[in-house]
C-alpha cells in the first residue's frame, strides 16, 4: 500500500500513559494534548520523507530508506540510528524505548507505538 499523502489526526488512545512512560513531563503532556498534528508522507519506492506538523508551527521530518540505517528523531525529540522495515504492508521501527508500526487502512494512517505494556494508537484521516 502506498503511503504518500497528507493526514490529519482524528483520534488517539492511551496518550497520557504512553507519554509518561517515555519520560515526558506532565506540563508538556498537557500542552501537547490538543495539538492538531498533520502528517505528510512522500514515498518514492523504498525512500520516504515523513513530516509531522504540530500546532504552533513546529515540524519534525525524518527521511529514511526501508532496510537501510537512517537517523530518526523520536516524538521526544531525541535522534538515533534505526532501520525501518516493511512487514506485511506496515512500516516497522524499533525506537530506543518503544516499538512503532505505521500502516494505511482504507483512507486512514494508523500509527501504533508500544512501551512497557502500554499501546498508544494515533489514527489520522487522509486530507490529500
Swiss-Prot record:
InterPro entries: Calycin, Fatty_acid-bd, ILBP. The keyword Ubl conjugation does not apply. PROSITE patterns: FABP (PS00214). Induction: Isoform 1 is up-regulated by chenodeoxycholic acid (CDCA) via the FXR transcription pathway. Isoform 2 is up-regulated by NF-kappa-B and in all stages of colorectal adenocarcinoma. Isoform 1 is not up-regulated in all stages of colorectal adenocarcinoma. GO terms for molecular function: fatty acid binding; lipid binding. SUPFAM superfamilies: Lipocalins. One of its GO terms (biological process) is lipid metabolic process. GO terms for cellular component: cytoplasm; cytosol; membrane; nucleus. Isoform 1 is expressed in the jejunum, ileum, cecum and ascending colon intestine. Isoform 2 is xpressed in the gallbladder, duodenum, jejunum, ileum, cecum, ascending, transverse and descending colon, sigmoid colon and rectum. Isoform 2 is expressed in colorectal adenocarcinomas and their adjacent normal mucosa (at protein level). CDD domains: FABP6. The modification N-acetylalanine is found at residue 2. Keywords: Acetylation, Cytoplasm, Lipid transport, Lipid-binding, Membrane, Transport. The keyword Ribonucleoprotein does not apply. Forms a beta-barrel structure that accommodates the hydrophobic ligand in its interior. Can bind at least two ligands per molecule, however, the stoichiometry is debated. Binds to bile acids and is involved in enterohepatic bile acid metabolism. Required for efficient apical to basolateral transport of conjugated bile acids in ileal enterocytes. In vitro binds to bile acids in the order: deoxycholic acid > cholic acid > chenodeoxycholic acid and respective BA conjugation modifies affinities in the order taurine-conjugated > glycine-conjugated > unconjugated bile acids. Stimulates gastric acid and pepsinogen secretion. PANTHER family: FATTY ACID BINDING PROTEIN. Belongs to the calycin superfamily. Fatty-acid binding protein (FABP) family. This is Gastrotropin. It comes from Homo sapiens.
